[in-house]
Amino acid sequence: FNRHVILRANATPADMADWMNEAHAVCEQCEHFIPVAAASNSRNENGELVFGMNDAGGVLATWPGTLGIAAAVKGYRIDLVDKFAATVRREWNACGLRKGYMYMADTMTDPRWQRTYGTFGEDPALISEIMTHIIPGIQGSAQGVTADGVAVTTKHFPGGGARENGFDPQYAAGQWTVYATPGSLETYHLPPFAAAVKAGTA
């Protein structure tokens, strides 16, 4: 019995909660009650549904895409991220989703990269500040995941946004990292991930 699943369906919050309750009921009948851990990619930004990219469109509270959130933070203030994270934690917890493959700490240094839409942009200091707020905000604490928190798996890895010809690093064509200047890895790509680790990313 598989207890670790990723939810891709664009189900309503009520349907997600019902499905999770039924899955846990099955687990309770097993010899060792090990609950189901349902994960998902992010669901609270950008209303356009794209399978494997944005797994839900308009089902939960819909905020701007991550680039829009970064722009709003840059032009407004960081507590916008705190409000966003609290919304995500509250809605996901109500649906029974306890793990998120989100958010991207990748620094976008090649505009050809097809995953730029999921980043917080090209400024490592801004991305780091967002990571410092968004992770504990969703997980419920800077010390880890609380009872009502959602575990955050930060994506993807340092240098992921600097691939040759903008190819995605999840595929063979994107296996080569191109750093335009000496020290690019340390200057642009490592700081947001260091901030995510310090913020307690799961």
Indicate residue ranges for each PLM-predicted region.
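Glycoside hydrolase catalytic-domain context in secreted enzymes
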Residues: F1-A202
